[in-house]
Swiss-Prot record:
An annotated GO cellular component: nuclear matrix
UniProt feature, compositional bias: Polar residues: 11-22
Transmembrane segments: none
Job description of the protein: Probable transcriptional activator which may play a role in neuronal differentiation. Able to bind DNA and activate expression in vitro.
Designated name of the protein: Zinc finger protein 326
């Protein structure tokens, strides 16, 4: 986790390449 594949908000908190998923 921490990429932004499932949940952008979650990944944003983790600290990864979070990209707002459609």
């Amino acid at each position: 986790q921490g990429y932004g594949f499932n949940e952008p908000e979650q990944t944003r908190n983790q600290g990864g390449s979070s990209w707002e998923a459609p």
